[in-house]
Amino acid sequence: MSVVSMKQLLEAGVHFGHQTRRWDPKMKPYIFTQRNDIYIIDLQKTIKMLDDAYNYVKAVAQDDGVFLFVGTKKQAQEAIAEEATRAGQYYVNQRWLGGTLTNWTTIQSRVKRLKDLKKMAEDGTFDVLPKKEVSLLTKEMDKLQKFLGGIEDMPRIPDVMFVVDPKKEKIAVHEANKLGIPVVAMVDTNTDPTPIDVIIPSNDDAIRAIRLIAGTMADAVIEGKQGADNADVEKELSESVEENSAEEVDDAE
């Protein structure tokens, strides 16, 4: 059984592509037809490729993978933050800062600055500083929070990046490609799918479509992490049983 039904995809408007004059010919294999000068995405292919994406993400999650959800367009911002957080993962939903991945060391120094400012705000340091200085520091903290808050606790560069609209997020995709980080993405009919490792043919403009696909990816992460946790528990139980059995043998001797 598929992770998402045809009915869910239709209700979310996943099948609506862009106008026929705004298309990328490389998306032709994923187009079913055109209606009123709008391309209609082949949802049979979307279902299959979404299942593939789900299984891939779940497998990486089982191996303790780190995931970065990226979607900075207005329609994606809320869903990206909520679904990444629900899965215990990380996100960029405002402007992508060039070098977020390829210049990770510098980004880490900015993240450290954000953490330091938060600590100053919490431990009372701001209370003893001049108001003007506090105002400047607060503005700096808010700006850093806006752009880096979603990756503040990311332990390392991600193992997989999930992207809404790789055409808009081309800098992020390019950085991931450069570092060999696999990209899973919602790819609309106006986008070149070539740089994407795991393609999900989909409307990438409708809020409901974005939430459905991003939510499905978050579910895959959660299921994978739970599977890993269960495997760890089973391993511990197995080792405990083996130890007890060995002790019983020793006692018998």
UniProtKB/Swiss-Prot annotation:
Highest taxon above the source species: Bacteria
Gene Ontology CC: one annotated term: cytosolic small ribosomal subunit
Pfam families (UniProt xref): Ribosomal_S2
UniProt xrefs under PROSITE patterns: RIBOSOMAL_S2_1 (PS00962), RIBOSOMAL_S2_2 (PS00963)
Entry similarity comment: Belongs to the universal ribosomal protein uS2 family.
PANTHER family referenced in this protein's UniProt entry, alphabetically: 30S RIBOSOMAL PROTEIN S2 PROKARYOTIC AND ORGANELLAR, SMALL RIBOSOMAL SUBUNIT PROTEIN US2M
Record-level Gene Ontology MF annotations: structural constituent of ribosome
Listed name of the protein: Small ribosomal subunit protein uS2
Stored InterPro entries: Ribosomal_uS2, Ribosomal_uS2_bac/mit/plastid, Ribosomal_uS2_CS, Ribosomal_uS2_flav_dom_sf
Biased composition (Acidic residues): 239-253
Region Disordered, residue ranges: 226-253
A GO biological process held by the record: translation
Keywords tagged on the record: Ribonucleoprotein, Ribosomal protein
